[in-house]
């Protein structure tokens, strides 16, 4: 019986590992909104291809999208290019599981060339965000489910922080919730083009 249980566990784990990140996201009902945006921005095909690297994706769950202000839907998610940029802000090249991180802060770069800070205490954190379900492994990367849609900015532009916090954390990420955050994100995207 013990051998059979271990065999079943191995087969189940192997089956999960054999799936790609897109397949895992598509099959998770809590991530269906994020999946629909990946699908609508043609990122699905890109993320399914085999590359010499893996991906790390911080996937906002459906509750995160439900909590977004209407302005995000009206001005960002309704525009194909902006929607794609917002989704890409949640993706890193390379596989970063919580097991790879020490308790110190690690700075990583998204595929849109924005720095984010990751750290781990008991759980994995993206600065100011809680990772609700970490380290879902796929054959081409790892998925971390987060509780909000990320907004990444230089700390000097974050009015919520003290000077000491701005000096200690040069990059801040938070949940996109206010008009100021939405306008800052739009401004940063527009300044790139």
Give residue ranges: language-model regions.
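Sec-dependent signal peptide recognition
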Residues: 1-6
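Hydrophobic h-region of N-terminal signal peptides that target proteins for export
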Residues: 7-15
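Mature, structured domains of secreted/extracytosolic soluble proteins
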Residues: 15-193
């Amino acid at each position: 019986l013990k051998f059979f249980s271990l065999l079943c566990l191995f087969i189940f784990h192997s089956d999960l590992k054999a799936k790609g990140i897109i397949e895992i996201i598509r099959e998770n009902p809590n991530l269906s909104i994020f999946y629909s945006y990946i699908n609508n921005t043609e990122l699905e095909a890109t993320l399914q291809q085999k590359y010499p690297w893996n991906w790390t994706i911080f996937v906002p769950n459906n509750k995160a999208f439900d909590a977004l202000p209407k302005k995000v839907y009206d001005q960002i998610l309704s525009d194909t290019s902006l929607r794609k940029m917002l989704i890409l802000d949640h993706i890193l090249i390379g596989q970063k599981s919580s097991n790879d991180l020490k308790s110190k802060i690690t700075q990583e770069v998204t595929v849109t060339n924005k720095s984010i800070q990751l750290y781990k205490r008991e759980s994995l954190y993206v600065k100011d965000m809680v990772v609700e379900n970490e380290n879902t492994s796929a054959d081409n990367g790892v998925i971390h489910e987060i509780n909000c849609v990320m907004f990444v900015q230089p700390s000097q532009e974050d009015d919520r922080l003290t000077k000491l916090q701005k000096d200690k954390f040069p990059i801040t990420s938070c949940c996109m919730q206010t008009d100021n955050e939405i306008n800052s994100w739009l401004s940063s995207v527009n300044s790139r083009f």
